[in-house]
């Protein structure tokens, strides 16, 4: 048993490990978010001062991004589905795949350690100096967080190399790149983004580490450094990172929508590929829209404003192609279809607030208010998470060979839908009214919307626990699937359910008609 899981070189077993790790980390991250909302449910302090509050906020962000969304989307779905969809026997480097996973538990341990030693890293996930320098954060907390990020980064880079190699080298003989499934494309582009952006983050946090411990002054004006340099380096990673979090979701939603619509491929398949490539490319040239308030030139701000708005074009292509895929079908409101429809609608709402924030003049006012929080939680908490949930209920029969209870799944979907919207929609109003981020207390005038927001988070918690209960119910009742009802253009369903330890004993042949 230990050998099977500790030394595994099988992409399915490693994918399952990623799922279990991601679900566990997701529960930790959810607990932290509940602490935040409990603190903000009423004016006045509940947990303590702003230091402990910001430590919770920082840990919540890091855990949700690096230990929940990325392991589940790229590690879980990516490992499980990419080889199956390509007809490959496994990933290109199976042992490196195992190492990618086993770097994550030590990494999350370092992160949790960082928040329980000294005063914790109360810097926000951006870790800006001088707040993160040894003047403001004297203990070892920030150093531990930096090491944690290094490990998570190494894990992601190795995984990215693995996926890129697999996708380039392990396709069937006649399969051209434009014939690859959209999910494989999305993971490939995501891997490329990881490979190009993470080394920049590694450089930035290494310089921060030496600033803190070796008396260098990369980010210290007293020695000729500049904290703005850190911001540029961080956001050059940080902006592609948010596209890394959503792109695999795009791929999953494309598959779910085309399959649930009974269509053999998504509308505008090639356009979808080019749209994802455009999003990936543009994601690298818009980073300074996170820094409109640091005093850049007017022409610089004009460029970053317009470049950011251009990203709305390929994103719109994807939204309308999904709607066109749905067009003309009798929509069957299955659980995975509900998640996909919720994704398309709420991701669009999140994208619209993003276009508003792209205006540098408006952003000067809205920067660091709850409007920004509402924006990125709409695209993450209702984009990435809805895609994860939709993908999970869609491919769960493939992964386990069992069925989930569809009636309970629908109840769970609507509970979660109400919960997340009730949590994050009022935050737009709070932001427009000027409530700043990263504070544990607020003036009484913001009380009512905060109470509603906190209420929504409690509903989301109930929905999350209901989901765990549904999975548990499925695992103990073992309703085994006899045969899949899937279309023949989705080759991952050609397997036994669940697939054999080695899925392809001979290479598939692609026939062109």
From Swiss-Prot:
User: Which residues bind Fe(II)-heme a per the record?
Assistant: 60, 377
Residue ranges spanning the membrane: these are: 16-36, 62-82, 101-121, 144-164, 182-202, 233-253, 267-287, 304-324, 337-357, 379-399, 413-433, 451-471
Q: How does it assemble?
A: Component of the cytochrome c oxidase (complex IV, CIV), a multisubunit enzyme composed of a catalytic core of 3 subunits and several supernumerary subunits. The complex exists as a monomer or a dimer and forms supercomplexes (SCs) in the inner mitochondrial membrane with ubiquinol-cytochrome c oxidoreductase (cytochrome b-c1 complex, complex III, CIII).
Which cellular components does GO assign to this protein? mitochondrial inner membrane; respiratory chain complex IV
Task: Spell out the protein name for this chain.
Answer: Cytochrome c oxidase subunit 1
Gene transcribed to yield this protein: COI
Give the record's family classification.
Answer: Belongs to the heme-copper respiratory oxidase family.
Cofactor binding description? Binds 2 heme A groups non-covalently per subunit. Binds a copper B center.
Binding of Ca(2+) occurs at 39, 44
Q: Provide a GO biological process annotation.
A: electron transport coupled proton transport
């Amino acid at each position: 048993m230990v050998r099977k899981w500790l030394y595994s070189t099988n992409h399915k077993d490693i994918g399952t490990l990623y799922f279990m790790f991601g679900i566990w980390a997701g529960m930790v991250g959810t607990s932290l978010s509940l602490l935040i909302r409990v603190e903000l449910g009423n004016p006045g302090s509940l947990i303590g001062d702003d230091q402990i509050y910001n430590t919770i906020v920082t840990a919540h962000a890091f855990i949700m991004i690096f230990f929940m969304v990325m392991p589940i989307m790229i590690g879980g779905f990516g490992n499980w589905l990419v080889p199956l969809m390509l007809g490959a026997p496994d990933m290109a480097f199976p042992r490196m795949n195992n190492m990618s996973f086993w770097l994550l538990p030590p990494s999350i341990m370092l992160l949790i350690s960082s928040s329980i030693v000294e005063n914790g890293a109360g810097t926000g996930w951006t870790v800006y100096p001088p707040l993160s320098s040894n003047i403001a954060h004297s203990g070892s907390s920030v150093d531990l967080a930096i090491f944690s990020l290094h490990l998570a980064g190494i894990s992601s880079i190795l995984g990215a190399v693995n996926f890129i190699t697999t996708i380039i080298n392990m396709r069937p003989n006649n399969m051209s790149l434009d014939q690859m499934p959209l999910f494989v494309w999305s993971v490939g582009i995501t891997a490329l983004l990881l490979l190009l952006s993470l080394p920049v983050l590694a450089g930035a946090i290494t310089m921060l580490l030496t600033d803190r411990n070796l008396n260098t002054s990369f980010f210290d004006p007293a020695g000729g450094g500049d904290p703005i340099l850190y911001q540029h380096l961080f956001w050059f990673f940080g902006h592609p990172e948010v596209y890394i979090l959503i792109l695999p979701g795009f791929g999953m939603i494309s598959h779910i929508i085309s399959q649930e619509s009974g269509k053999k491929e998504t509308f505008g398949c090639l356009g979808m590929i080019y749209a994802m490539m455009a999003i990936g490319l543009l994601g690298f040239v818009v980073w300074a829209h996170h820094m409109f308030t640091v005093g850049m030139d007017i022409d610089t701000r004009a460029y970053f404003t317009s470049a950011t708005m251009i990203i709305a074009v390929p994103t719109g292509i994807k939204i309308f192609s999904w709607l066109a895929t749905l067009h003309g079908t009798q929509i069957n409101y299955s659980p995975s279809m509900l998640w996909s429809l919720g994704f398309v609608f709420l991701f669009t709402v999140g994208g619209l607030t993003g276009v508003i924030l792209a205006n540098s003049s408006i952003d000067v006012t809205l920067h660091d208010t709850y409007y920004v929080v509402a924006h990125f939680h709409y695209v993450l908490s209702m984009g990435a998470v809805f895609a994860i949930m939709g993908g999970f209920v869609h491919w769960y029969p493939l992964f386990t060979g069992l069925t989930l209870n569809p009636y309970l799944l629908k109840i769970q979907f609507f509970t979660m839908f109400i919960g997340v919207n009730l949590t994050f929609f009022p935050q737009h109003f709070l932001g427009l009214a000027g409530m700043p981020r990263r504070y544990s207390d607020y003036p009484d005038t913001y009380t009512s919307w905060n109470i509603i927001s906190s209420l929504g988070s409690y509903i989301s918690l109930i929905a999350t626990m209901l989901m765990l209960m549904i999975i548990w119910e499925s695992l103990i009742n073992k309703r085994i699937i006899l045969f899949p009802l899937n279309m023949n253009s989705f080759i991952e369903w050609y397997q036994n359910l669940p697939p054999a330890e080695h899925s392809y004993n001979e290479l598939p042949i692609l026939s062109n008609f």
